[in-house]
Structure formats: C-alpha cells, structure tokens
C-alpha cells in the first residue's frame, strides 16, 4: 500500500481516537448481519438468529476484538502488510477456507464503523487513506489464495 506521509499521519492520529475493542466488535457484528452467509464460519458462536443476537453475542465481540487488534498491528507495518498477515492468510486459506471476498467486505465494515465512531474527524481524505489500508489488508489476507 502506498500512502503519503500525510495519510500515514492521519491514520495514526485517528486510530488513537478509536475504541478498538468496540470498533472490532461492531465491524464483525455488522459483517455477520449485513452479509449473513459469512455466519457459516461462526456457527459455533451460539445465537446468531437476529441482528440484536449477533451484536450482543459475547463470542462475536471477542473475535471482533481479535480481528481489530490484528488490523491495528497492520497499521504499524503499512510497508509490509503481506508479511504482517502471511500467517493469517495461510490460516484463512488452508484451514478455514474463507472466501477472500469476505476480507474486502470486512474492510468495508471497518470503514463504516470508523466513520460512525469518528464522526466529523473522519474526513473524505481520512476515509481515502483508510480505504487504501483496508484494501491492502484484504489483499494481504488473500495473498495465499493466489
């Protein structure tokens, strides 16, 4: 991912304002509600029968926290996303057989949640920078599939 110094500074500054645990829980919850076929990977999480059940599910929240912390780790290694996500790419490809399109969809949910949480601070320029990052992360996670 090619980011300017200004974009990197914006990402770093805005990320510091984000409650990562809440954002991760909300992003994964939204993914499961908006794209219900993604639930197939989480059937063992218990009740996913409605939007409120998904959004209140403790296991969804815990996994969302895990996901967003991996994303945050990627923010520290923007120049080596493929290396940063290599083991997760292998896991999701070889063992979990996740559709690589789901990574892009999750990235969309992360951007939506950031817009919601950051409000007016999430300017169009900031969104453009984060869109580059989530696309880069999705590509890195899908790398093993190629």
From Swiss-Prot:
GO cellular component terms listed in the entry, alphabetical order: blood microparticle; haptoglobin-hemoglobin complex; hemoglobin complex
CDD domains, per the entry: Hb-beta-like (cd08925)
Binding site for heme b: 63, 92
Domain Globin: 2-146
PTM annotation (S-nitrosocysteine): residues: 93
PANTHER family in the cross-refs: HEMOGLOBIN FAMILY MEMBER, HEMOGLOBIN SUBUNIT BETA
Protein name per its UniProtKB record: Hemoglobin subunit beta
């Amino acid at each position: 991912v090619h980011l300017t110094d200004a974009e990197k500074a914006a990402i770093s500054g805005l990320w510091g304002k984000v409650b990562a645990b809440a954002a991760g829980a909300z992003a994964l919850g939204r993914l499961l509600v908006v794209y219900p076929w993604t639930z197939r990977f989480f059937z063992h999480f218990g009740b996913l029968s409605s939007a409120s059940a998904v959004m209140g599910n403790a296991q969804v929240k815990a996994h969302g926290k895990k996901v967003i912390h991996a994303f945050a780790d990627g923010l520290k290694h923007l120049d080596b996303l493929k290396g940063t996500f290599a083991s997760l790419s292998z896991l999701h490809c070889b063992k979990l057989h996740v559709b690589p399109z789901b990574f892009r969809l999750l990235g969309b949910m992360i951007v939506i949640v950031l817009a919601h949480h950051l409000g007016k601070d999430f300017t169009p320029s900031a969104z453009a920078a984060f869109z580059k990052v989530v696309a880069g992360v999705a590509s890195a996670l899908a790398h093993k599939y190629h």
